[in-house]
Swiss-Prot record:
Reported cofactor(s): Mg(2+)
One GO cellular component, as annotated: cytosol
Its biological purpose: Necessary for normal cell division and for the maintenance of normal septation.
All copies of domain EngB-type G, residue ranges: 31-204
Family: Belongs to the TRAFAC class TrmE-Era-EngA-EngB-Septin-like GTPase superfamily. EngB GTPase family.
Residues given in the record as GTP binding sites: 39-46, 65-69, 83-86, 150-153, 183-185
SUPFAM superfamilies to which the protein is assigned, alphabetical: P-loop containing nucleoside triphosphate hydrolases (SSF52540)
Source superkingdom: Bacteria
GO function terms (MF aspect): GTP binding; metal ion binding
The protein, known as: Probable GTP-binding protein EngB
Gene3D superfamilies xrefs: P-loop containing nucleotide triphosphate hydrolases (3.40.50.300)
């Protein structure tokens, strides 16, 4: 069964959850498909979500570390985008920082519906310890990863591609492979490529088979009338 491209402009806010336990209460971890966005508090996560959905769906703040909740946005009845709390901001109290990191790890390891993870990093300061931890958690769980090098407009094209190649080389040891792409919310750099990757993650084989079966059943019911 073929399906047209997912329209990310249809994303709408669904719920916020303070932690993985509450998220599992609201949305069981084995229902539908989720794509998670994770990154340091100043990586431009909210701006990226706003560009990709072409709306101000995620709240941006001049104060890094302000997003403390897991925010879920619905694309359709089967698919969701998840904005995870930013990590690594120095001014956040240590206890809260550790709670966030524990929650992020638990989310990546225990959400069976997770179809892919976008790890956003400032292209000028990529692959910090927590970035690597997020990537390793996802790879260990056999979840596809896109390392998105944000604020790519801050570098010239030559320096930009040099950094992209360096990051690809540093991540090449992961057997399942980690995609690496430059991105700029300001200039729209990489938007098309990212949407293509997200679109493919939204269409796992099991879901496409389910949708095909549902369509056949619906047609059979219609034919009875």
């Amino acid at each position: 069964m073929s399906e047209s491209h997912i329209d990310f402009r249809k994303a709408e806010f669904l719920i916020s959850a303070p932690d993985i336990a509450h998220l599992n209460e609201y949305l069981p971890g084995d229902v539908g498909v989720e794509i998670a966005f994770a990154g340091r508090s100043n990586a431009g996560k909210s701006s990226a979500l706003n560009l990709l959905t072409e709306q101000k769906i995620a709240r941006t703040s001049k104060t890094p570390g302000r997003t403390q909740l897991i925010n879920v946005f619905r694309l359709d009845k089967h698919r969701r985008l998840v904005d995870l709390p930013g990590y690594g901001f120095a001014q956040v109290p240590l206890a809260l920082k550790l709670k966030w990191q524990e929650s992020l790890g638990e989310y990546l390891l225990k959400r069976d519906c997770l179809s892919g993870v976008v790890v956003l990093m400032d292209i000028r300061h990529p692959l910090k310890d927590l970035d690597m931890q997020m990537i390793e958690w996802a790879v260990e769980s056999h979840i596809p990863v896109l390392a998105l090098l944000t604020k790519a407009d801050k570098l010239g094209q030559s320096a930009r591609m040099k950094m992209v190649n360096e990051v690809r080389k540093k991540l090449s040891h992961f057997e399942d492979g980690v995609k690496v792409e430059p991105f700029s919310s300001l200039k729209g750099i990489g938007k098309g490529k990212v949407l293509g990757i997200l679109d493919s993650w939204c269409k796992p084989e099991w879901l496409m088979q389910q949708l095909e079966a549902d369509a056949i059943a619906a047609q059979a019911e219609a034919d009875k009338d």
